[in-house]
Amino acid sequence: MGELLHVSSSPHIRSKVTTDYLMKMVIVALMPATVAGVCFFGWKALLLVCLSVATCVATEGIYETLMHKPLTIWDGSAVITGLLLGLNLPASAPWWIPVIGGVFAILIVKQLFGGLGQNIMNPALAARCFLLLSFTGQMTNFTAGGGLVKLVDTVSGATPLAAVKAGEKVDLLSLFLGNTQGTIGETSALAILIGAVFLLIFKVIDWRIPCTYIGSFAIFVILFGGHGADGYYLLEQLLGGGLMLGAWFMATDYVTTPITKRGQLVYGVILGCLTGLFRIFGASAEGVSYAIIFGNLLIPVIERLTVPTAFGKGGVKHEK
């Protein structure tokens, strides 16, 4: 389905499915994670997500109006950017964090590169990385609570991955259900997987990128994580942090992924290895956002190496 939005090497595929339809389906698929975030972190989480969505839509509308461009706020792409950005924020973040992030995502990453289909990075993830670098304290404060479900504590509000990196064990059921610390939309693997199954059933996304991403990450952890084939540690890494949200909803972004099937497999492997590299050998316990951003920048190279050879190209020239 990504062929609708992707400016890529030929061959180009025609489809009757509209961009508007695809965006609405992704929005629906993100609802379980959004609802779970509100249940675990309270109404403040919903406020941050709504602020993020409103800022993204408003920024896109204002920019396109001022630049005398056709309004695209109704296609749903800005809403998805706002949703993903909001779900990648800690519930304790101040109100101005999603506002700054939303403006950066739409104005800098998306519109200044030409709008939908032209941006070279996932706008929501680029904004999250920008916020992490610029407002580290606000973006790494995971002490929020106040939801309908009591959160399982680790150490002073640390995320499960931080606890794992410190040598602690974390509760796998809490990681699966989501009643633990983390960003608003990443804690519940169950809610994310419900949305992922929805997208797969309706063929909104392809299995190749998320499955090769998660699979290659698992292999990397087994080989280099220092715990061998320890199933408990592997599940902590798979269910903790932003891997599930990143693999199913951000690595599959239509604009910033390869269009060829071989390219998608290569892309997934690269993301899995980069995430493992950042998590295991990096200073931070997480690495999904940076891995996907680096992967986005490699898309032209991946496509150049994996694009099918045109019929008749590369044949042997016979002398007359």
Predicted regions and their residues:
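Cytosolic-side transmembrane-helix boundaries in multi-pass membrane proteins
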Residues: 1-22, 281-320
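N-terminal signal-anchor module of multipass membrane proteins
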Residues: 1-57, 64, 318-319
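C-terminal ends of transmembrane helices
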Residues: 10, 58-70, 106-117, 194-203, ...
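Alpha-helical transmembrane segments in multi-pass membrane proteins
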Residues: 25-33, 48-60, 77-82, 86, ...
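Structural signature of hydrophobic alpha-helical transmembrane segments
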Residues: 42-55, 92-101, 175-189, 231-243
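Membrane-interface helix-loop-helix junctions at boundaries between adjacent transmembrane segments
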Residues: 78, 83-150
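Long hydrophobic alpha-helical segments that form multi-pass transmembrane helix bundles
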Residues: 118-193
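Loop-to-transmembrane alpha-helix initiation sites
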Residues: 120, 124, 234-242, 264-266, ...
